[in-house]
Regions:
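Terminus-proximal functional modules
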Residues: 2-100
Length: 100
């Protein structure tokens, strides 16, 4: 069978369309977490937007990597959620709301 450019372009467009919902879902995924610094001990609660998978396991490594650059150690990921559950978390997270 002879494939034309139109067939190849159509197949590529279909694959792209199938991949877009996952990218959109990841962009609308958030997590809240607790972190600490030592000497002196400091604790914080924060909210981040996740760039990768919307799961606690993925969030753990992603958040730990982001906050490490400022000397923070991740204690735990409390939850993973979508934008509809962001309401009210800004006041609790304060300075650490979407900081990382």
């Amino acid at each position: 069978m002879r494939y034309t450019f139109r067939h190849i372009a159509l197949a590529g467009a279909m694959l792209l369309a199938l991949a877009l919902p996952d990218a959109a879902a990841a962009a609308d995924c958030f997590a809240d977490y607790k972190a600490k610094k030592d000497n002196p001990l400091k604790l914080h609660y924060g909210v981040v937007q996740l760039r990768q998978d919307c799961s606690k396991d993925s969030a753990r490594s992603e958040i730990a990597k982001r906050i490490r650059r400022d000397g923070w150690t991740l204690l735990n990921v409390l939850s993973v959620f979508d934008a509809s559950q962001l309401s009210g978390k800004e006041s609790s997270a304060g300075h650490f709301y979407l900081r990382y």
